[in-house]
């Protein structure tokens, strides 16, 4: 919106300059006096839009792996899963290398969620196998994250349980990146909004130092500033997505 306002102002400024030049040149010319007067009226009607500095705040999302990933990342062979009589995964086979960035797209959104749950060990496949490389460490963003916050922790306590470094200042540094500051740290996670919970989960992923990120619709509940920050963080991420 601000860019559009700037472009509109630029066009108005060009028009103002054009009108001023005509008025200056022909205001004393009897044959052009009516045209000059008309342009004066047009000039008076042009108003530049007031552009105020943006008050929007952007989180700082930066996923930094603690360990460089090796060549062998993930091997999936013949993975199948049936739920309530419906075949969700059918003989799925693929491999991931160290430079891969993969998006799972299909008509059944449930399929990728089930695949992720299998790959992180929350669910067993009916058939097939998968194997993570020995140098990999995974961080998972679940589509349904309600259970992650079904406790009495405050935000700082909640994130500390996932951090190897238990120093409060260290943990709050990650929360600060996600726009949690001051008294926010003692807010109970159970009362957080959807967007705040997503920012907590992204803090958890950052603090993990994982070199493989599995994200299941992470932009739900996020505002445009947070989505932009997440996109920038993923672009810079040197690991596997």
Where are these regions (language model features)?
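Extended, highly charged alpha-helical segments
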Residues: 1-60, 126-127, 162-166, 170
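ABC ATP-binding cassette signature C-motif
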Residues: 1-7, 63-241
């Amino acid at each position: 919106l601000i860019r559009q306002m700037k472009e509109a102002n630029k066009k108005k400024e060009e028009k103002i300059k054009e009108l001023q030049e005509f008025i200056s040149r022909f205001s004393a010319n009897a044959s052009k006096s009516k045209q000059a007067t008309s342009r004066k009226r047009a000039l008076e009607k042009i108003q530049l839009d007031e552009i105020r500095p943006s008050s929007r705040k952007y989180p700082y999302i930066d996923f930094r792996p603690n360990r460089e990933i090796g060549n062998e990342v993930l091997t999936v062979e013949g993975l199948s899963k049936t739920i309530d009589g419906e075949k969700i995964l059918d003989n799925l086979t693929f491999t991931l290398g160290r430079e891969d960035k993969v998006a799972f797209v299909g008509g059944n959104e449930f399929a990728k969620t089930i695949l992720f749950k299998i790959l992180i060990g929350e669910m067993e496949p009916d058939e097939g196998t998968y194997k993570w490389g020995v140098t990999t460490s995974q961080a998972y963003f679940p589509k349904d994250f309600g259970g992650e916050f079904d406790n009495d922790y405050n935000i700082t306590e909640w994130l500390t349980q996932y951090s190897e470094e238990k120093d409060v200042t260290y943990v709050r540094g990650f929360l600060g990146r996600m726009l949690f500051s001051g008294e926010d740290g003692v807010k109970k996670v159970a009362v957080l909004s959807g967007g705040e919970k997503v920012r907590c989960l992204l803090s958890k992923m950052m603090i993990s130092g994982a070199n493989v990120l599995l994200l299941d619709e992470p932009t739900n509940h996020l505002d445009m500033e947070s989505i932009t920050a997440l996109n920038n963080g993923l672009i810079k991420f040197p690991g596997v997505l």
